[in-house]
């Protein structure tokens, strides 16, 4: 398993709107390259590569967003079934015609209540952004979508300092991945980027930089990223440490940054900066 990190690929970064309209191909490598281009700088995107069968092995790819899925359902009903049940068949392509391989997996292997097929990259992005898991199989021009939605709900606190009468009552908690999932649920776009980094020599605190690729000014994103990477400090115990260190004019009476406990407000600021 690997999380998609900041990496180079063979597809132009500014061509995502054109890429997302493409249908899925039978070549799993081509599909993966396009999805990695669309999800570049999305550190919560998980690409799980594996093979099924033995003679010959068939390449597969699971794709989901960490924090949006029920991990137990994913592990027990999808990954375990694919890695154990299918491996007992030496040659799945001979047992099922290649065109029916997806049907065989759909009907006999994956054990979830919600399961359907999709055929475009745009559908892949939309479903994983909603908490579903997508399975791509080499040689198949369609993908399977498994309903694995299962994010934090009632354990997420009501904001104490930003009380509202109307609208969502959810507030951020101390778990970073749960917090990014709260924003990801509201911004179901491949242009919403989450870049991960670690700050603090002793605390090794996980920090994420969130922005919408075609809305946030690139020079602003680059400057914030640069200032975060230049922070040299022993401990980061709360967000005030970060805010103080990246501000340009520390003595000004004018606000240079806002803090919020509400994911809907954070999402709104990303969409309408």
Protein language model regions, located:
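Membrane-embedded alpha-helical signal segments
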Residues: 1-273
């Amino acid at each position: 398993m690997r999380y998609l990190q900041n990496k180079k690929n063979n597809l132009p970064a500014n061509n995502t709107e054109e890429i997302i309209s493409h249908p899925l191909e039978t070549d799993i490598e081509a599909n993966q390259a396009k999805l990695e281009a669309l999800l570049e700088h999305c550190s919560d995107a998980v690409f799980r590569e594996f093979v099924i069968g033995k003679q010959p092995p068939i390449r597969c790819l699971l794709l989901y967003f960490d924090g949006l899925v029920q991990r137990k359902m994913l592990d027990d009903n999808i990954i375990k079934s694919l890695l154990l049940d299918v491996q007992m068949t030496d040659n799945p392509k001979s047992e099922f015609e290649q065109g029916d391989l997806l049907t065989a997996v759909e009907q006999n292997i994956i054990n979830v209540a919600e399961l359907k097929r999709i055929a475009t990259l745009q559908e892949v992005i939309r479903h994983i952004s909603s908490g579903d898991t997508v399975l791509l199989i080499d040689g198949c021009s369609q993908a399977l979508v498994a309903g694995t939605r299962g994010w934090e709900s009632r354990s997420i606190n009501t904001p104490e300092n930003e009380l509202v009468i109307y609208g969502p009552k959810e507030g951020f908690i101390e778990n970073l991945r749960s917090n990014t999932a709260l924003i990801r649920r509201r911004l179901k776009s491949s242009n919403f980027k989450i870049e991960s980094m670690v700050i603090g020599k002793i605390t090794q605190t996980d920090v994420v930089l969130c922005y919408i690729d075609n809305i946030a000014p690139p020079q602003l994103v680059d400057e914030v990223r640069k200032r975060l990477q230049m922070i040299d400090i022993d401990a980061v115990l709360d967000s005030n440490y970060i805010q103080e260190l990246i501000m340009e004019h520390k003595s000004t009476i004018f606000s240079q940054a806002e803090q919020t406990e509400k994911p809907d407000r954070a999402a709104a600021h990303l969409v309408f900066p």
